[in-house]
């Protein structure tokens, strides 16, 4: 995808709004949830049979309290899910966003679809906000036409990149960017679409194993480094403990939405270096799969996969009987451990429990 400069760009307006971190598209049962104080009318009705609980987290500036929300009931093979986010120890705002759609029945598909997405924004929250509001709409709209999960994920990512450019950069000069990690569960399969350095883990085999399901799109990834250099870009290694970065862009990720000054040729960019093309992973779900975890790089900058798995199981194996509360507490435990290890970034974690504990 190539981009053309829009007239003369005199300045770039970077957005850093502290919007709602968790965006759920919903057609909820109001009577069931209104007493929780979370109810909001949906922006758009995706289908006539959406089974979606309301869930939102609104951070306040300079508020380092971890925000946690969890499911209230099970959705087929999804026994529970939860999300926790924290702006971190250094940042005065949170650019992470989440969209969760627990289960939707589309007339075009035999099986219901569950959708979880994590967006790690940078340079302002504009791009992450845009993705949280639009990527799922692109996906479900395309899915009605294609009825193919993989194609719909790819098409939804491509359309989101194009529409963010035309509606935000060309109009508002919003040069913010965002990583994106989407997880779709459908017909016994787990689909992951990844752009950037957020990561998905799978816990399985009676707590004994944890597997990394996605690839981190970082300059240290040799395949990404080779791709960038072949496209005419450069990877500059950090000195000592410094972070390696790509040029043009001077970014520590090799794939991202937005960041159009790094992509527009007339502004010194290269559209083949920093790309928003997702890497797709497909896994058949088996009885040994126990949970899926999505987390932003602020978690994995300071924690190994095994540490995350261990802290998750310390909570899931605990005495609490309510699986939904367990999922929420597990998310919070991961975030708190990352903060204890002095993560300087925004930190967000989603856990989807696939097996009764």
Residue ranges of predicted features:
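PP2C/PPM-type serine/threonine phosphatase catalytic domain
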Residues: 1-357
């Amino acid at each position: 995808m190539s981009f053309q400069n829009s007239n003369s760009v005199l300045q770039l307006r970077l957005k850093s709004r502290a919007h709602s971190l968790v965006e759920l598209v919903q057609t909820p049962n109001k009577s069931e949830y209104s007493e929780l104080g979370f109810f909001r009318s949906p922006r758009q009705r995706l289908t006539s049979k959406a089974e979606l609980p309301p869930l939102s987290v609104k951070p306040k500036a300079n508020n380092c309290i971890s925000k946690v929300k969890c499911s209230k009931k099970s959705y087929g093979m999804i026994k529970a899910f939860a999300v926790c986010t924290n702006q971190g120890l250094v940042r005065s705002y949170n650019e992470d966003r989440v969209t969760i759609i627990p289960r939707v029945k589309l007339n075009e598909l035999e099986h219901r679809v569950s959708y979880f997405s994590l967006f790690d924004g940078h340079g302002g929250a504009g791009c992450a906000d845009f993705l949280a509001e639009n990527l799922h709409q692109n996906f479900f709209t395309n899915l009605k036409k294609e009825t193919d999960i993989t194609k719909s994920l790819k098409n939804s990512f491509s359309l989101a990149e194009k529409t963010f450019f035309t509606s935000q950069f060309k109009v508002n000069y919003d040069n913010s960017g965002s990583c994106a990690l989407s997880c779709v569960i459908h017909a016994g399969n787990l689909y992951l679409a990844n752009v950037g350095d957020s990561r998905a883990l799978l816990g399985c085999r009676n707590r004994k194993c944890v597997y990394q399901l996605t690839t981190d799109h970082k300059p240290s990834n040799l395949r990404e480094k080779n791709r960038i250099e072949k496209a005419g870009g450069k990877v500059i290694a950090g000195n000592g403990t410094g972070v390696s970065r790509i040029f043009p862009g001077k970014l520590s990720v090799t794939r991202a939405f937005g960041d159009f000054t790094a992509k527009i040729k007339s502004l010194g960019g290269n559209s083949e270096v920093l790309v928003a093309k997702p890497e797709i992973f497909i896994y058949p779900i088996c009885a040994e799969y126990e949970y899926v975890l999505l987390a932003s790089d602020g978690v994995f900058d300071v924690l190994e996969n095994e540490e995350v798995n261990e802290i998750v199981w310390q909570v899931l194996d605990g005495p609490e009987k309510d699986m939904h509360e367990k999922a929420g507490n597990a998310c919070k435990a991961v975030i708190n451990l990352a903060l204890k290890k002095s993560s300087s970034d925004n930190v967000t974690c989603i856990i989807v429990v696939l097996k009764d504990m």
